[in-house]
Amino acid sequence: MPDRPDMAAAVAAPPLTNLIRSGGEMFNWTDTDGRDNQLLTRLVLEHAGPGRTVLVAGPHPDGLVAALAGAGAEVTWLLRSLIDAETAARAHPGITVLSGAFGKADLTGGYDLVVAAGGIQRLNSAEGDQLAAGELLDRLAAAVRPDGALILMHDNQLGAHHTVRLDPGARHRDDAAWHPSETTEGPAARSQLTAHLTGAGLVVDAAYAAFPEPGDPAVLIGGVTLGDVTSPLRPWLRTVLAQAYTVAFRGRPVLSDPRRLVNRALRAGAEETVAGGWLVVAHAPGDTEPAREWHDVLVSDVHGVYTPDAAEPGVTGRVDSLVRERIVNPVAADRLEDRLLELCAAADVRRLRQEIAQYESWLGAGPVSGPRALADLSDLGITADGPVVMSARWSPAEPVPAQIVLVRALWQFAVRLITWGRPHPWPNTASAADLAAILAGMAGRSLADDELRAAIDLQVVIDSAEFGLGPAERQAHRLALLAVQPGTAPLDVAGYHELTEALWRQRYQASHLLAMMEWNEQIIRSRDSALSKMDWELQLLRRTWGGRSLMLAKRAYKKVKK
């Protein structure tokens, strides 16, 4: 809840001529508007333009509204919080701000574009009638003029972000949780959402599954690619989705790593079921039909928004010793990392050696430049002609020695083997460095300590550019990478399940060491017993005449032999 407003400052403030109170506004309340999203901003701006009327329904990032106003659109922003509405009216004097419940707002004039990218959950007001989800969708559809468009994001209650959530006490701690989250009303699937909008008189142009979360989507999958397990984009999508979930859930407490759930769903063609939400673009029938082709996949990363079939130039420039670069090369091939994981699980050392040797020969002997110098094994696809880079976001400003490139890739693979708890032929290795040395030996290379530290430093630079780490976070991240050993939990997304697995591995290692100590003690005791018995027999022989005779004969034999 916000702090109590300063009444003197409120009275002295100039009147807001662009603020209209429609009734049902929430007074001592504020909504979080989230952060700017490149993907949503691009989709919205493609439908906006000079002179077009736009209704932004509910809380949205301030940058999205500013971009609409900057494009020349006539923007109306509806907010249920009076405090938020006053703040928005002061920050954007050129737009009209409506404050109140969605059900009381006068939307009879209609709009050329209706944007509800924040969903329908925050359109109702506690001070007004609680409209059902179907009624909210109907009012949104009715607000669209003929030939106008609706851009709507709808939360998926079965999404991976809800399934892995680990936030005890959120219902009592979060003020926004006054509305029940486990609602039985409204669309619960993408097909139900599109059917409802169609029944409301709209024509659905595109219906995407949004990942990883509806409030900040980074990947949109739709069209024929959604659910198609035979699509050549599948291996590339696994890499893209893994990166998106890593960025979204890095350092957040979760029940289990969402990347595993999404990866399994993607392999089964069920990614729509676990998507964070569904983004629907629809239009109201009019005199002209929109002539536009919709991409099946849209991706947003640190460089900008792009599609796999027509990669557009992203943000250029340098970050530390890295150069921003975008490589999008989806191929119908397995990922090299998946191939190596399967071979490790099968303990097929011969084929594992062949794959690593082929990767080492692909790198070459000289310094490596371009995207392949920083490509992870998960970014590489396997083809008949050898490895290919399917996805890359960075290139080194200067060429990197091939030995460092090889060591970094194999060391990172060793870290994933250990932290993910994946089976491999060398379970008794003491650390990721030892396992990386074994893998490097399969390529006929040795691994020196300075080479390993240089490879880890390079990984820290990449992670810093990718996740925006500060100096203190860099140092902590570097120390964590150096300390990876059996029993270490994942360093990026450590869920409760993964922490439990890591604890079990630590206990197993401890019990194994205790069993080894007990076995060593038993061996030592048995050998001590045997030595004591032999010593007793020797002393017994020395005390008898027969034993003494044998000892004298032995000494005489030695003297004669000399």
Could you say what each language-model-derived stretch is?
Residues S22-E25, T30-T53:
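Conserved alpha-helix/loop element of class I SAM-dependent methyltransferases that forms part
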Residues H60-G72:
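Conserved SAM-binding loop of SAM-dependent methyltransferases across substrates and taxa
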Residues G128-A149:
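A short glycine-rich, Lys/Arg-flanked "PGG" loop and its adjoining helix->strand segment in the class I
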Residues L152-R173:
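Conserved class I S-adenosyl-L-methionine
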Residues G169, D175-E182, P367-P425:
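Catalytic activation segment of kinase domains across protein kinase-like and atypical kinase folds
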Residues E182-A209:
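Short alpha-helix
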Residues L220-R324:
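C-terminal lobe and adjacent flexible extensions of AdoMet/dcAdoMet transferase-like proteins
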Residues A465-K562:
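Boundary detector for helix-to-coil junctions that initiate low-complexity/charged tails
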